[in-house]
Curated annotation (Swiss-Prot):
Expressed in spleen, thymus, pancreas, testis, ovary, small intestine, colon and lymphocytes. The lineage of its organism: Eukaryota, Metazoa, Chordata, Craniata, Vertebrata. InterPro entries: ZP-C, ZP-C_dom. The gene is POMZP3. This is POM121 and ZP3 fusion protein. Pfam families: Zona_pellucida. Residues 166-187 are annotated as: Disordered. It comes from Homo sapiens (Human). GO terms for cellular component: nuclear membrane; nucleoplasm. Coiled coil: none annotated. Residues 177-187 have a biased composition (Polar residues).
Amino acid sequence: MVCSPVTLRIAPPDRRFSRSAIPEQIISSTLSSPSSNAPDPCAKETVLSALKEKKKKRTVEEEDQIFLDGQENKRSCLVDGLTDASSAFKVPRPGPDTLQFTVDVFHFANDSRNMIYITCHLKVTLAEQDPDELNKACSFSKPSNSWFPVEGLADICQCCNKGDCGTPSHSRRQPRVVSQWSTSASL
């Protein structure tokens, strides 16, 4: 089994694009210039293609929501480390604006695609915010059979065992969300 490090660099969103822009829209808007070869936006093929893409996007969003509903009480716990996978956050963090983790490479049976998509939902808080049960990054260590945080006190990961990380029991102050955005990348 091959593990590959994935680095998430937390950077401010690019204001030139809307939150709903998909990578193809971003690439085409930054790389292309108006040309006479552009498809007619009113052509039947263009409209059908756009509807097909919209349906595909909605299906992916619905699947993501189904997954997230099941993971809601395991916030910030990298739960696949409990199985035979060796996914884990890297400790220490490479920098204050970087969170790094590894994931096992896998392939679905009967799926010939050569690309996978990884969706990460990040909550950004102030650097001065002390890690707590709601604002943490925890991995499972099989040798010690316990959860450990990237930073902060070890007990902030105890909720990962219970599967209930929804309410901070010893938060020093309420987290303040600085900003939220989403982005996509190919590996």
